[in-house]
Amino acid sequence: MNDFSLELPVRTNKPRETGQSILIDNGYPLQFFKDAIAGASDYIDFVKFGWGTSLLTKDLEEKISTLKEHDITFFFGGTLFEKYVSQKKVNEFHRYCTYFGCEYIEISNGTLPMTNKEKAAYIADFSDEFLVLSEVGSKDAELASRQSSEEWLEYIVEDMEAGAEKVITEARESGTGGICSSSGDVRFQIVDDIISSDIDINRLIFEAPNKTLQQGFIQKIGPNVNLANIPFHDAIALETLRLGLRSDTFFL
C-alpha cells in the first residue's frame, strides 16, 4: 500500500488467518488472470476455481504456477467435489486434487442431496491429507430460506469438529442463496446468532460476491472478516472497503 500517513483500520498481513480475501476464477483468459493477480497480489489470499471450471481450463497449471509465484493459495469449487460424489468417484476426485498439488480442498453439499453428517464424514476422511474448507448452506434459495439459525449453528460446529479448517457460508456467485435471501439481502439474524455463539468467527468465511454484501459483513464484523467469491475486478476495491477508503465504509 502507498502510505501517506492516513489513520486507517489495522489490517492483517499475508500470510494471514483473518481478513482473508478469496477471489473466484470463472474461467478468465490467462493473460487477464496473470495481470489481475500481479496487480493486486498483496490483497489476495486464495483463488477458487469456480464450480467445475478447472476441468475446462486449458492453462490451469500455468494459472496455478502464477498463484504460487505470488504466495496465493488455490482450491477447486465444492460443486466439483459434489459432481464426483454423485458419480461415486470420490477416489478420482482425490487423485485430481493430488495431481494438481492442492493444499486446500472445498467440501460442500449445496447442490447434491447429502446430509450434513454425510458431508462431515467426507471432511473427516479428506482432512487427513488436505486442509478442508467446508461449505454450509443450500444454493437453492427456497431451501435455504427454510434453514433456521439452529441448523446453521449445528452444521458449522459439526463441520469444524469433523476437521474443517474453516467453514464457508454459502451465498453463491450471485448472492441469492444460502445465507442470503432470494432478493440478495443477508439474513443478518443468522449472522448475529453465529456471532453470539461460541463459534470462532475467524474460522468462518462469508461469501460476498458484490459490494453490498462486502460492505454489510465489514460493517457487521469488522475490516478483518474473511470474505469469498470476490470477483477479480474487485480485489483492490474490496481492500478500500476494508480500510474505509470508500464512501460506503468511510466511517469505520
Swiss-Prot record:
This protein's UniProt keywords: Lyase
EC number: 4.4.1.19
Domain of life of the organism encoding this protein: Bacteria
A single MF term (Gene Ontology): phosphosulfolactate synthase activity
Enzyme class: lyase
Primary role: Catalyzes the addition of sulfite to phosphoenolpyruvate (PEP) to yield (2R)-phospho-3-sulfolactate (PSL). Is probably involved in the biosynthesis of L-sulfolactate, which is a major constituent of sporulating cells and mature spores.
Family: Belongs to the phosphosulfolactate synthase family.
Protein known as: Phosphosulfolactate synthase
